[in-house]
């Protein structure tokens, strides 16, 4: 009687899970099928886990670990507020990198002789370590535990980054030279260097993210997501796991594409975002002419009540105030008042890719009403009222009017072209780019100061009276 080939069954399972990953990713491209796509991808991962258990020596131990980890993840997912999703995404990226980091570490400890496979092990640990510590740094920045760092810390971080990358390159080079016989090192010495390498990869991740400002966090999170996928793919190669390779490649490629798209939407290079920042991009000392024109909630209501077309532009201020539900309520009231309502969404508004989309989706705002700059800017001059809720740099006219501005050339939502602009803001503070916003001083601009949720609630109350 022939023995059943469990290895073949395992490979078939991996191929099936890879197909589910790809199909699920395809479904995520449409708002109507995104939820189903998420479930399809989740089922693909469950299938990959189950077939992996086929040749595990102690499946009970693995199932226990899965149960504990899954329970913790479920609790986090159920308890997290929608406004804290960026922090959660950063943590998930970090734990993905940490998994690859530990897997490669374990594989190194199992190796008794020096081989070229060690180069993959080193690469996996380096990328996984950067992803983990960099994601932790991003998490604390998003949580506002870490504020903007000093020039000294930024300068020190750059040198630490250079040192970490150089040390990693030398460690990988010495493995290649050792295998080729050009530089023979004892295994004990290599293990000592390896411990230093473990620490250096974590320090490099911190040095990479610490100097980056909060305004660039969406791009940072996207890149860290890509790195977590690359680390997973490398880990899959090390342990010859097909599902891990496919999943890692999908995450790595999609994350990198998204990173490039977001950088383009800011009209900046990745080098400028990660190694220069806004401060070195130019000067914003030009004197702004005009004066601030405050408006009360009662007067603001009269303006928007008479409007036939309104554009709502959400920003990080809406997320902080958790105002997405009252924003949706205001939009519904305006539509009931025979007003055309749309939402202007800038790709880098908020603190993560799609931050505003997530918040508005939670409030059940129709995806069809969400417009990007290229879609709404040509029609901006016929918009009666543009309501800017906690957005700053993404509506700053300096990007188009001041060649010396740090954000000059960045595509923005050109709300200053609307007939009336109503800006909801706590204070006159600048955005993360540190650039004063001439929009606030425009003749057609009115400032409604205060908490965004409270201000919009007052407008809603006026409509209901």
Where are these predicted regions, by residue range?
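Structured cytosolic domains appended to multi-pass membrane proteins
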Residues: 288-465
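Hydrophobic core segments of alpha-helical transmembrane domains in multi-pass membrane transport
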Residues: 14-25, 45-52, 67-76, 103, ...
């Amino acid at each position: 009687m022939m023995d059943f080939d469990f290895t073949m069954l395992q490979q078939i399972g991996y191929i099936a899970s890879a197909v589910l990953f790809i199909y699920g990713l395809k479904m995520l491209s449409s708002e109507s099928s995104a939820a189903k796509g998420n479930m399809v991808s989740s089922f693909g991962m469950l299938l990959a886990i189950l077939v992996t258990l086929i040749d595990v020596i102690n499946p009970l131990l693995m199932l226990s670990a899965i149960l504990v980890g899954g329970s913790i993840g479920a609790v986090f997912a159920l308890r997290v507020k929608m406004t804290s999703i960026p922090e959660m995404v950063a943590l998930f990226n970090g734990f993905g990198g940490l998994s690859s980091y530990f897997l490669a570490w374990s594989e190194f400890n199992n190796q008794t002789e020096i081989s070229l496979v060690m180069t993959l092990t080193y690469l996996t640990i380096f990328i996984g370590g950067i992803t983990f510590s960099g994601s932790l740094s991003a998490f604390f920045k998003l949580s506002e535990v870490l504020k903007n760092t000093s020039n000294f810390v930024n300068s020190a971080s750059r040198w630490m980054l250079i040192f970490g990358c150089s040390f990693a390159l030398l460690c990988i080079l010495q493995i290649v030279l050792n295998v080729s016989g050009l530089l023979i090192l004892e295994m004990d010495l290599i293990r000592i260097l390896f411990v230093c390498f473990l620490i250096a990869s974590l320090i490099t991740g911190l040095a990479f993210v610490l100097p980056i400002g909060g305004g660039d966090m969406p791009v940072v999170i996207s890149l860290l997501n890509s790195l977590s996928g690359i680390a997973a793919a490398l880990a899959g190669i090390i342990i010859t796991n097909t599902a891990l390779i496919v999943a890692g490649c999908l995450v790595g490629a999609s994350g990198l594409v998204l990173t490039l798209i977001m950088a383009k939407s800011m009209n900046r290079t990745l080098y400028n975002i990660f190694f220069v920042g806004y401060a070195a991009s130019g000067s914003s000392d030009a004197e702004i002419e005009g004066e601030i024109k405050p408006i009360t909630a009662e007067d603001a209501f009269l303006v928007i009540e008479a409007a036939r077309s309104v554009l709502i532009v959400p920003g990080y201020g809406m997320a902080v105030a958790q105002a997405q539900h009252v924003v949706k309520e205001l939009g519904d009231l305006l539509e009931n008042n025979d007003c055309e309502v749309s939402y202007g969404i800038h790709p880098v508004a908020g603190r993560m890719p799609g931050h505003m989309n997530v918040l508005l989706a939670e409030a059940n705002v129709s995806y069809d009403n969400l417009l990007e700059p290229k879609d709404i800017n040509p029609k901006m001059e016929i918009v009666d009222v543009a309501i800017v809720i906690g957005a700053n740099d993404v509506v700053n006219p300096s990007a188009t009017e001041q060649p010396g501005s740090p954000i000059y050339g960045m595509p923005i939502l050109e709300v200053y072209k609307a007939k009336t602009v109503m800006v909801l803001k706590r204070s006159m503070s600048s955005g993360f780019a540190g650039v004063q916003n001439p929009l606030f001083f425009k003749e057609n601009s009115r400032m409604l100061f205060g908490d965004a949720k409270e201000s919009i609630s007052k407008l809603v109350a006026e409509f209901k009276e």
